[in-house]
């Protein structure tokens, strides 16, 4: 059965999610019925069609004042309703029969916010950013998505950086046993920075994004602890923004219990990328630079040429990700997993009902 979703917030992630839906072929399984965004429809359609990072969308896009239209090669089109509602409790999710709201605003993230979408008629909510501790689950697809149940109505997809580093941490921990670690995120500039010097509550972010490498706060270590409780207080992280518009590199250093060599580490990463985490983690030894990972759908790409081992127990890795495109693809994967958990519960109920009838 087709999953009906609505996108709340049509910025970098919201637009990437919609484009990834069609480029991945998942539009055969997911139907976007509405987009809620305060911007003008003309600008929404234009930025969906043309993107400075991801190029031109391969599907023709048009609009009227109430809809986005996505054209198909066979002459048919998808009509997506445009909403301009700032109060999420007033959104018509009930009338539109929305299964899951993909909240890509970056603004909402509490249980109360999720319940507001549900009160408006949505069955479930998936936040595109780290959320409060009182939500039902935080999912890093490929690592813990199988923990989803039908009872998980308010879910977070974590962040682009947790989706990048957590699967790699799992691989290393499963193979060698991690004791502790540190992470430096080297992140492309974002739209919370200034084009030229201007006011911001974070004084470092008052400075022009194109002119400096800018340290920013990060709570990545908290996200790791949420997914792996055994690593609470075992990881620390720092982050810097650099003057590129997309793609992020992550410098991961971990101490492990087992004696290891570089070849051991790379073999473990390469093998898992070809089996259990295929499509989530990739491995390369090609001499690539950041632009080469633009529009890559993987959560993480390990650069095996940069793997280092010191004193047999300290591992250093360089891991790349397209912080927009990879994350947008995981939003779709997680939404489908949430939907599948409902289908599984329905099947189990039917099976129990048949057994009860047979035994009566």
UniProtKB/Swiss-Prot annotation:
UniProt enzyme class: oxidoreductase
Reaction catalysis annotation: D-erythrose 4-phosphate + NAD(+) + H2O = 4-phospho-D-erythronate + NADH + 2 H(+)
Which compartments does it reside in? Answer: Cytoplasm
Annotated site residue numbers, Activates thiol group during catalysis: 187
Which residues hold substrate?
159-161, 205, 218-219, 241
The Swiss-Prot or TrEMBL record annotates one GO molecular function as:
NAD binding
The residues responsible for catalysis, as annotated, are: 160 (nucleophile)
Classification of source organism = Bacteria, Pseudomonadati, Pseudomonadota, Gammaproteobacteria, Vibrionales
Would you tell me the protein name for this molecule?
A: D-erythrose-4-phosphate dehydrogenase
EC annotation from Swiss-Prot or TrEMBL = 1.2.1.72
Q: How does it assemble?
A: Homotetramer.
Sequence similarity: Belongs to the glyceraldehyde-3-phosphate dehydrogenase family. Epd subfamily.
